[in-house]
Amino acid sequence: MEEFDGEPTVTWIPGVNSQKKQMCFDWGPGEMLVCETSFNKKEKSEMVAGCPFIHIIRKDIDVYSKILRKLFNESHGIFVGLQRIEEELTGKSRKAQLVRVSKNYRSVIRACMEEMHQFAVADKDSAIGRQFSSQVSILSAVELIWNLCEILFIEVAPAGPLLLYLLDWVRLHVCEVDSLSADVLGSENPSKHESFWNLVTTLVLQGRLDEARQMLSKEADSNPTSAGMCRVLGDLMRTMPILSPGNTQTLTELELRWQHWHEECERHLQDGTFASNPHLESLCKVLLGDDAALLEHKELLSNWYHFLVTRLLYSQPTVKPMDLHLYAQSSLDLFLGGESSPEPLDNILMAAFEFDIHQVIKECSIALSNWWFVAHLTDLLDHCKLLQSHNLYFGSNMREFLLLEYASGLFAHHSLWQLGVDYCDHCPELGRVSLELHIERIPLTTEQKALKVLRVCEQRQMTEQVRSICKVLAMKAVRNNRLGSALSWSIRAKDAAFATLVSDRFLRDYCERGCFSDLDLIDNLGPAMMLSDRLTFLGKYREFHRLYGEKCFVDAASLLLSLMTSQIAPRSFWMTLLTDALPLLEQKQVIFSAEQTYELLRCLEDLTSGRPLCGEPDAQQLQDDDIETTKVEILRLALARNLARSIIKEGSLEGS
């Protein structure tokens, strides 16, 4: 069970006084709206103008940084590749792949950090430059933590090689010595440079003994009186036993050799070999791993974990992983000396040295401004089978919780939401539910973006979300009077009610303009026209016009009559249909049979009598309208004449 945290972080909103005014707020998936209200439970509300602002509080502002977006995009590819690592791989092959993935993550962090550093240098005097510098420091700390976790949890380095990894770790993250070396070696007489001994000492503190010996040779060349001492100290550095990667000696052999070497260093110190040169004597004390001597160079060590690794190098080179936390804690205490308290970074590194993965993740979650680091590190550690036993108090596992929190921040961005989809896909327990909740809240600002969102939903058989998104797009299209687009979206949503609404708008538009818009869409409805009766009518009515245009009068007449007698046509459209029948009634050839003409007469009488049919709404009394009355009279006359013609024609056919 995960314990609850203490007090939550307080976010101060400029211009808002929560002591005097009550706050109104509304949560969203990626942000919160906050405003002041005049409501007060104790006092009567005064009609005084309050704060006119609505504040938007975003929890993941880093997604809006252009440089960090590169980090998010590139790490997404690494994350997806990691999920595809075959479970069958075991042992060294699987471990090698996981280490390679970890290094890829770190290279992305470092590339992002270097780019941000360039921006910080370019704008060092501006507020933006200071913001970049702050971000560089954060990324540097992130890479420092990740690298240590890689050594301890992924490489799982044993005693011996462990120290080599830690030395590389310190050298990578304490790199001021390189610029110092360039300054000293670039001078006319390096051994006389004011920073010469600082450089030699720093090289020794980092275990770069070959380079330190080269610097001592320069001192020996320029100062013959100390040449012998430099040669002795150089020999001590050269003969120091270190377990190199290709070395086959055992830890026991290494410890014996190191013990002899250590005794030799101590003998030279006691014999006063370097007594006449304080710099060389101080370096010999460093080689002995003397705490006091190391702390004299506190400024050159710069931080406690550098002190820790140097201390281990010269006093416990075969330190076991299980003992690391003891040396780490004592090194931290000695380095701080009670003068200051540990920083959040110190606590995180200490938790790592204690092999407390969950505490590392928890401390990072509190200290960092976004979920990128903890989400990806936790996922990688989960693939190393290190987190299986840890569930959060609300039932989810830690990996999914952190990945989904990170994904929720991506969904708040106008383009990074597509990355968030993949993170949800790889969370088998709650990923689907989270994706369904977030996908409906993506602002559909353009049709191209809407199609991308729909494609995501359709690929995952998210039927309800597809329907919901299509409804939203259909409504937008109706508001913009784009009826064709609205009809297309309503068909895609399989929304019969909305398809009926849009079909009515098409028919109303036809009555006003006398022609249809979006003919290609209506002509190619196909089986989709069966979605609603009104849509069926729209498609069939358009088919009537097509048949009439192709002079297929008999087929057109049969279709027109079936539209009326089947009661699929809205009652308000009957007069239009009867009016459409007039040209067919006036043809030289008899189109409507006597029976069909009787049906048309019945429909006309039903319409003019105002008698509603089968629950059809909006039956209106058209007798008072002179224009409609004229239409009715013309229709009656045309129907009567057609009836007479059809009876004569049918009688003649029977007689023959």
Curated annotation (Swiss-Prot):
It is found in: Nucleus, Nuclear pore complex; Chromosome, Centromere, Kinetochore; Cytoplasm, Cytoskeleton, Spindle; Cytoplasm. Keywords: Acetylation, Centromere, Chromosome, Cytoplasm, Cytoskeleton, Kinetochore, Membrane, mRNA transport, Nuclear pore complex, Nucleus, Protein transport, Translocation, Transport. Its main location: nucleus. Belongs to the nucleoporin Nup85 family. The modification N-acetylmethionine is found at M1. Disulfide bonds: none annotated. Component of the nuclear pore complex (NPC). Component of the NPC Nup107-160 subcomplex, consisting of at least NUP107, NUP98/Nup96, NUP160, NUP133, NUP85, NUP37, NUP43 and SEC13. Interacts with NUP160, NUP133 and SEC13. Interacts with NUP37, NUP107 and NUP43. Interacts with CCR2. One of its GO terms (biological process) is nephron development. GO terms for cellular component: cytoplasm; kinetochore; nuclear membrane; nuclear pore outer ring; spindle. It comes from the Eukaryota. InterPro entries: Nucleoporin_Nup85. It comes from Bos taurus. The lineage of its organism: Eukaryota, Metazoa, Chordata, Craniata, Vertebrata. The keyword Coiled coil does not apply. Essential component of the nuclear pore complex (NPC) that seems to be required for NPC assembly and maintenance. As part of the NPC Nup107-160 subcomplex plays a role in RNA export and in tethering NUP96/Nup98 and NUP153 to the nucleus. The Nup107-160 complex seems to be required for spindle assembly during mitosis. NUP85 is required for membrane clustering of CCL2-activated CCR2. Seems to be involved in CCR2-mediated chemotaxis of monocytes and may link activated CCR2 to the phosphatidyl-inositol 3-kinase-Rac-lammellipodium protrusion cascade. Involved in nephrogenesis. This is Nuclear pore complex protein Nup85. The modification N6-acetyllysine is found at K92. GO terms for molecular function: structural constituent of nuclear pore.
